[in-house]
Amino acid sequence: MMIKTRFSRWLTFFTFAAAVALALPAKANTWPLPPAGSRLVGENKFHVVENDGGSLEAIAKKYNVGFLALLQANPGVDPYVPRAGSVLTIPLQTLLPDAPREGIVINIAELRLYYYPPGKNSVTVYPIGIGQLGGDTLTPTMVTTVSDKRANPTWTPTANIRARYKAQGIELPAVVPAGLDNPMGHHAIRLAAYGGVYLLHGTNADFGIGMRVSSGCIRLRDDDIKTLFSQVTPGTKVNIINTPIKVSAEPNGARLVEVHQPLSEKIDDDPQLLPITLNSAMQSFKDAAQTDAEVMQHVMDVRSGMPVDVRRHQVSPQTL
């Protein structure tokens, strides 16, 4: 009886500890920059789903990854409540985008923001939400700078946004004041391009990071935007790209390919089936003798969002 009681206490303790761990704010994923010639940073982790281990979104938040990134890395997982005992791959390893390692680089295709702090040999990777399909809500590519930043921002929704909300039975005021009901959260960083209509901002919701849910702006978890807000200054370069596939010929001989689902352009598009166009450099990478083109094509079809080695391995005659 005593053993059973003691076991029950330990079980209660570990259940509580797991719940607390999921509830704690996630730390930003900061990695040292790779050596010359490499683009690989980070390291994947594994998560064993506990009994009543929380939703997939809660697990994504714990490791500070995006919801869709976690879903793509674990095909077949229940998107709401993963099965207890299942092992999830946490996609923390990535190839740095093919863009200057300066300021903020956002790859909307992979729903990630990369921040390169000045004077430091590191990069911090944040999951983001971007503009949803339809009308003026798409997030555009651009090269711009931070023009302004503001704590406790108000929100002035556009006429189109107000009309969209009204169609859902929600009457938005002309200006939404700062506070718990403001979907911009507690911090906003304004971009100079397009007249300053696009911002990086927080959120008052627990869902939507790593998804296409915003009205065109870049959405981050509140703890992430708070950290980024404290680090960037007006004039910081911001480069927004749309690159669903990244490749790297690594110094150690690995030939890495990372493929994400391309962004849909129509509501009925299936991003898993949308074609991926290779530029000349990527086509040369695929056609190279060192690359197993069949394996690379398979990686392009699966679209796991994680780097995969597609180098061709030589078969010794003695093993034939």
Curated annotation (Swiss-Prot):
Domain LysM stretches: 45-90
Signal peptide start-end: 1-23
Active site per UniProt: 201, 217
Keywords: Cell shape, Cell wall biogenesis/degradation, Glycosyltransferase, Hydrolase, Peptidoglycan synthesis, Periplasm, Signal, Transferase
Pfam families hit by this protein: Ldt_C, LysM, YkuD
GO biological process, one term: peptidoglycan-protein cross-linking
Cell compartments where the protein resides: Periplasm
Chief location bin: periplasm
Cross-referenced CDD domains: LysM, YkuD_like
GO molecular function terms noted in the UniProt entry: glycosyltransferase activity; peptidoglycan L,D-transpeptidase activity
Domain L,D-TPase catalytic residues, every copy: 102-241
Consequences of knocking out this gene: Simultaneous disruption of erfK, ybiS, ycfS and ynhG leads to loss of covalent anchoring of the major outer membrane lipoprotein (Lpp) to the peptidoglycan. Complementation with ycfS restores some of this anchoring.
Biochemical pathway: Cell wall biogenesis; peptidoglycan biosynthesis
EC number, UniProt record: 2.-.-.-
InterPro entries assigned: LD-transpeptidase, LD_TPept_cat_dom, Ldt_C, LysM_dom, LysM_dom_sf, Transpep_catalytic_dom
GO cellular component entries: periplasmic space
Function: Responsible, at least in part, for anchoring of the major outer membrane lipoprotein (Lpp, also known as the Braun lipoprotein) to the peptidoglycan via a meso-diaminopimelyl-L-Lys- bond on the terminal residue of Lpp.
Known partners and oligomeric status: Interacts with DsbG.
Family under the similarity heading: Belongs to the YkuD family.
Protein name from the UniProt record: Probable L,D-transpeptidase YcfS
